A protein has these predicted regions:
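Conserved phosphate-binding loops in N-terminal lobes of ATP-dependent enzymes
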Residues: 2-66
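Short glycine-aspartate micro-motif
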Residues: 6-10, 61-63, 131-136, 142, ...
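Glycine/GP-enriched mid-protein hinge/lid loop-to-helix segment characteristic of carbohydrate kinases
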Residues: 19-21, 30-31, 38-42, 88-89, ...
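Nucleotide/phosphate-binding catalytic cleft detector across ATP-hydrolyzing
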Residues: 1-2, 6, 86, 101, ...
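Glycine-rich phosphate-binding/hydrolytic loop that grips phosphoryl groups
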Residues: 21, 109-111, 115-122, 246, ...
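Adenine-nucleotide phosphate-binding core of ATP-dependent small-molecule kinases
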Residues: 31-58, 173, 182-239, 244-252, ...
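Glycine-rich phosphate-binding loop and adjoining helix at the ATP-binding site
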Residues: 41-46, 58-61, 70-131, 249-262
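Short glycine-rich anion-binding loops that position phosphate/pyrophosphate groups of nucleotides
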Residues: 14, 67-70, 138-140, 244-245
């Protein structure tokens, strides 16, 4: 947890949140704003930094969680292939943040948003599992593999870069089977009508067999896809976060079935839904910076 107040930001494709965390690690103040990730450079930077400007104070360190592709040590992103943030590709964001918020460039730090989310969830459990995996389900599939709260991004025990979305299922990216778009598409094929994920989840909870089968298939697929990595990683705890985790009652049983299909020992793996909601990446970014810099 921070030894002194720290500023944090969580940047998404359509939103930005800035917050101040106190020495206890709890969110003391926060500001939220909409973000147009396709805006021209100057307007995008203004939108990006506006919430943080309201909280800025001299000498404050900032931890910023945002998606890649991004060179986090350098503070520069390419954002290749994501269709977002193209106007600030190649921009030195460390300098931009430093200048806008009146702090030293050395006090501006960047971390992957999925890693920040996972670290936040890792801190939420008093037991703090040694080998911890967090999978976030929403428009995509995010992931973090943590060893004592620090990210593991290479080696045979994790997917390339620690990114679960690079796992393939039948030659296709995992997100083609497990994401909000995948759920919507699968339901449309099976039921012949379009519904949003929350509507499909409500229908499944009410006993709609078509809606239920869509969730079962997706979660069994997810479990089977990540099981080899959870086994190699000697995972102690798995957390499922993101928007789809709100439908936990629909997810847990088929997820466990998929995990243990070929890896029987994973049937007893500790699994839980995320606890912190949208505060997870804020708390995680602060914790990561505090432990990596000693501040």
């Amino acid at each position: 947890m921070p030894h002194r107040p720290i500023g944090v930001m969580d940047v998404g494709g359509s939103h930005v949140t800035a917050a101040l965390l106190g020495p206890s690690g709890a969110v003391a103040e926060r500001r939220d704003a909409r973000l147009d990730s396709g805006a021209p450079r100057e307007r995008l930077l203004e939108q990006l930094l506006a919430p943080a400007r309201e909280l800025a104070r001299p000498g404050l360190s900032w931890a910023i969680a945002l998606p890649g592709p991004f060179d986090y040590p350098a503070g520069v992103g390419t954002f290749a292939g994501v269709g977002k943030f193209q106007s600030i590709a190649g921009v030195d964001l460390r300098f931009a943040v430093s200048a806008a918020l009146g702090t030293s460039a050395a006090d501006v730090h960047f971390v992957n948003d999925a890693i920040a989310y996972g670290i936040g969830e890792w801190t939420a459990d008093v037991e703090r599992a040694t080998r911890f995996v967090c999978i976030t389900l929403g428009t995509g599939v995010g992931s973090s593999f943590l060893d004592r709260g620090m990210p593991v991004e290479s080696g045979e025990e994790v997917p390339p870069h620690g990114w679960a979305f690079l796992i393939e299922v039948d030659g296709q990216p995992l997100e083609r089977s497990v994401s909000t778009a995948a759920i919507v598409a699968a339901y449309r094929r099976a039921a012949g009508q379009s519904r949003q994920v929350r509507e499909i989840a409500a229908a499944a909870s009410a006993g709609d067999p078509v809606a239920e089968s869509v969730f079962v298939r997706a979660m069994e697929t997810l479990g089977a896809a990540i099981a080899p990595y959870l086994s190699r990683f000697s995972t102690d705890e798995l957390v499922i976060g993101g928007g789809m985790a709100r439908s936990w009652s629909l997810l847990e049983v088929p997820l466990r079935a998929g995990l243990s299909r070929e890896y029987r020992h994973l049937a007893d793996l500790r699994i839980r839904p995320a606890l912190l909601g949208d505060e997870a990446p804020l708390i995680g970014a602060a914790d990561w910076v505090t432990r990596t810099t000693g501040n």
